[in-house]
Amino acid sequence: MAARQQTKHLFVTGGVASSLGKGLTASSLGNLLKARGLRVTMQKLDPYLNVDPGTMNPFQHGEVFVTDDGAETDLDIGHYERFLDTDLNGSANVTTGQIYSSVIAKERRGEYLGDTVQVIPHITNEIKDRIRGMAGRDVDVVITEIGGTVGDIESLPFLEAARQIRHEVGRDNVFFLHVSLLPYIGPSGELKTKPTQHSVAALRQVGITPDAIVCRADRPIPPNVKKKVSLMCDVDEEAVISAVDAPSIYDIPKVLHAEGLDAYVVRRLGLPFRDVDWTQWDELLRRVHDPANRVTIALVGKYVDLPDAYLSVIEALRAGGIANDAGVDVRWVASDTCETPGGAAKALQNVDGVVVPGGFGVRGIEGKLGALRYTRENGIPTLGLCLGLQCMVVEFARNVIGLAGANSTEFDPATPYPVIATMADQMEVVAGRRDMGGTMRLGSYPAILAPETLVHELYGCLEVRERHRHRYEVNNAYRQQLEAAGLVISGTSPDGQLVEFVELPRSVHPFYVATQAHPELRSRPTRPHPLFTGLIRAALLHRCPPIPLDTEPVPTAR
């Protein structure tokens, strides 16, 4: 029997500045390697001291991406899942907080046998265990993105661990990819390489020499500049990759492929590979850049000043557009602007559909309710997600049933009509008697759909699984009243105790649907989520005159 090939490790580092697109570069390379027939998994090492981003301010961190096993992770894990078209788990995101918590717990249990616990070897060994834990019999390549920028104090233990991994598994089994910035200086009309040179020098100071450099720039990089980077940073000229700003993130795999990055990596690591078949990806890009139709979808949210707070929602909308051969123009609507009927009418004027995403806290809630009342009364296709479902129920209770003051106990503990209430197992958290972090209803849970409902039609089955992140639920004491007034409870947990989906009948509204889950987390560009596909289809039909929907099915993964 042939010996199993050693799992290869590819580390992605960043230099000069943050937000260069390390995650997208790593995701796109993973996409290319998978298209070449390799089995790829990915991991993000985050240098912050938080255990996870679950309690971090969305304005600072962006969205929290929840995996099937309930881990609250960095938004880059969402990029990994979408580009690899695979489900990852909590081991895909490692933070300094997790590492130190684990090491300190082991020290308290006496596992270090009286050793003086230090960054080297104890912290670095813990990091290495997490990295090597991603390898396995069914994995050819582990791509590990090291967060932060080379030179940051917080990143040093992760870089040292990566250096040691190379020493332990062999240099032929490890590849270091450095993503750096080539800034353009207007007065001189030049792309400058010096920041990248200093960045690579800083990397060398910790014992790492990059095998390839991805040069980010806002304009094409001339051959003489690439040659200079090659010479001064001591990498092969073919390993200097030009990554100019792309119109769409889904262009990046083709950009990197055209530069030869994937071919260089597989040759350098001695991996077997096949050629990439671009047929289906090209059709996806055609729908991205030259769609047959366009729709405008309003996103009514609390954190619209930072679009990354809703990254997966936006990508799910775009994927729903791809499925319908439609471009999606997102109108960012701060929920506060919709508190009055006039404000909602102005903010939502001429939109073809609305999505009300998740969130926490009372700020902006009355605006979400105002937006939902406007879309319900005016027949505008609407999709509610998590908090969006709760707001749909509150708005319906107030304005259809007539329960004045109906609310969620999250926003008004003294409400006379608590149509949304704290889940039983969350009472101690809300009361402050348990930790807040990592204690919500997290991860993938099943739901049973009601036959002949819109969600049943969209999913095409009666049992589904979706990812969740919430503490509050529809109060069962009001379910009978809600249903009697016309709100359809179209999906529940298998035991019937938790409301998972609500909708209005199509005889009343063309598309008014909400879920307690976060379906955006399971959407892929090549496998759009049915709820978002349905929203975009309804938005196209809502336009006047209706646009013919003669599109082919969305392309599947290569």
Swiss-Prot record:
What more the UniProt record tells us is: CTPSs have evolved a hybrid strategy for distinguishing between UTP and CTP. The overlapping regions of the product feedback inhibitory and substrate sites recognize a common feature in both compounds, the triphosphate moiety. To differentiate isosteric substrate and product pyrimidine rings, an additional pocket far from the expected kinase/ligase catalytic site, specifically recognizes the cytosine and ribose portions of the product inhibitor.
InterPro entries, per this entry? Class_I_gatase-like, CTP_synthase, CTP_synthase_N, GATASE, GATase1_CTP_Synthase, P-loop_NTPase
Which reaction is the catalytic activity of this chain? UTP + L-glutamine + ATP + H2O = CTP + L-glutamate + ADP + phosphate + 2 H(+); L-glutamine + H2O = L-glutamate + NH4(+); UTP + NH4(+) + ATP = CTP + ADP + phosphate + 2 H(+)
Per the UniProt record, the source organism is Acidothermus cellulolyticus (strain ATCC 43068 / DSM 8971 / 11B)
EC numbers for this chain: 6.3.4.2
Q: In which pathway does it act?
A: Pyrimidine metabolism; CTP biosynthesis via de novo pathway; CTP from UDP: step 2/2
Q: According to the UniProt record, where is the region Amidoligase domain?
A: 1-271
Keywords linked to the UniProt accession: ATP-binding, Glutamine amidotransferase, Ligase, Magnesium, Metal-binding, Nucleotide-binding, Pyrimidine biosynthesis
Please state the gene responsible for encoding this protein: pyrG
Name of the protein in question: CTP synthase
